[in-house]
């Protein structure tokens, strides 16, 4: 670890795929509490800008921090990627503090699309921020557009809070001149912020929150000490369904259960977690997980790998101490419980955006202060990989699981999805068959639309057949190479329970690079949040899908795009009753 005079921390991470990865601690949307919710997220969208033909890049805003990364592709170099990312924050050697009203307006529209996307596909319920005075969704809404000048002032104010002690940089290689470049830019920031925000309200403990969730989860407040962090790292590397959350200076260990009986036993204090010592902890974490640790605990003064001997040699005492602290918090009701609830009628609390939620007190009724049993945990295995065809009945459940677990990755092709995970076959089956997970998987049908229409365009099945079997979609043979004949009609209007545009497009020079560039152009116009595309077996032919509240504008953009020599697009209007009758008439897809 290299520490600049103003406390910027720089790490060389030659294993990561990114060229540069930068994080800013104490800079997430928890800072929006008592201000305009969404300022942090809007700032992230305003800062990131790049040439998608030369770079891959992304940014994210979480409760506690913001992060950005950039990777060079094609003719660009690692140095180009580093300079591109730095340019998001500095202009002519000075920290950016000026944002045009037109750009702010476009990105607010994009935020509304992101809100729509996330609430169609996920249940975006941030319980900790809600209990601390924020909302269940804190990413920004369209009504920010009514206060553009105030929003712009807040953005400038937020930039002035960035300080060297907040900055963490991962760089793949520290090339000639790179360190000096960092010193001239991020190294020029004050070691403490020019503007110090008010303290973040403390979340209310001793609560049971009933909300849509795939698992029964108990968030146990523990002290944010080095030993407890090492204990969390030990548990995370060894077991599934264990993680941590932070808000302000508070630290929670999160433990999820698929069995309600085990959850109740843990909550009543009659059972403790069955934690066994493994052979060794390797700290072989992803760069995302490592970055999150440094950002959530900015007081860490060493490289995490400096603690690898301690976490292995002292694991027994670390885990005993952590287990005792967990049990003490359970008994003292220093917890927040998430109980899966899918009833739309049941409601006693609303946030300002009208999301329904039930909040109850976690009482001491039935507490047993001497545990007499232990609960086994799901152990991580070495990485497994499976391939699921679009016709497999487990497709949607696996997609739902990947959306709820960050350590499961999906890759799509014309025939199905490739899934990488570290669960045992028995554990996967237990999750898939659990009552709460099944209800959660079915509670957000919007995710299925992407695969319903992919199956329609990539197979010989009629829309009626697919809708009749929508819980599995229908299998098609990989040996059948489709020949798609585009008819005269380029637009088919339907009614579904979500608003989206999808379809197939073909073009002589059409490739993934041009589609990525197209997606970013649509994002800059505020018309979409993201666009998924899948390369079909037919030459130069892709399937596109995007959730959007601006369906007509997106259709016009795609319909008038010169890269497409042929197209067949479906435009969905949101409604209570589905109507796909237009797809039964003259859509021409031959095999």
Swiss-Prot record:
EC category name: hydrolase
Record bears the keyword Zinc: yes
DNA-binding in keyword set: no
Compartment annotation: Virion
SUPFAM superfamilies hit by this protein: LuxS/MPP-like metallohydrolase (SSF63411)
MF (Gene Ontology): metalloendopeptidase activity; zinc ion binding
EC number(s) per entry: 3.4.24.-
UniProt keyword annotations, A-Z: Hydrolase, Late protein, Metal-binding, Metalloprotease, Protease, Virion, Zinc
Family: Belongs to the peptidase M44 family.
Chain's role: Probably involved in maturation of some viral proteins by processing them preferentially at Ala-Gly-|-Ser/Thr/Lys motifs. Does not seem to be responsible for the cleavage of major core proteins.
Name this protein carries in UniProt: Metalloendopeptidase OPG085
Primary gene name: OPG085
